[in-house]
Amino acid sequence: MDIRQAGVEVKMGSKTIVEEEEIEEATKNVPKDTFTVLDFIDVFKDMHPEDWKNLVERFGLFGSKRRYTVTTYLSNRLDVYSHKPYSTLTPFTRYKEAKFKDYRRTTKEEKKIFGSPWIAVFKKKLENKNAHAVY
């Protein structure tokens, strides 16, 4: 049974909370060709303020004494979305064998928000490079 609340998709027995279309729509509106989850969040929370509020209530922000925060959730969703054949992102390379191919060190400001010294960097596919949607 599906439960819908303010545009946030919640499925019983499933981990889908935000619809994939919302993920794709927000990635298209990120003004950079390469971006972090923090850049994505800046766009997502402006486009979907109620969804953002619900996600923060569910997962919390960094510093709220939770291991799995809203930034972790959305970063994981971007990772999974990047591997879909229709994704507008290049497939994200996960950390392996002490290699941080698609990661970079966080700035001091980013670390205060994100918590980790490393942050994933997502890249738009070349054919979508200049195709920024307008919402």
Regions found by a protein language model. Name each.
Residues D2-A26, E50, V56-Y135:
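Phospho-regulated, low-complexity intrinsically disordered regions of nuclear gene-regulatory
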Residues V30-T36, P49-E50:
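Short capping segments at the starts of secondary-structure elements
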Residues F40-I41:
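A short acidic, leucine-rich amphipathic alpha-helix
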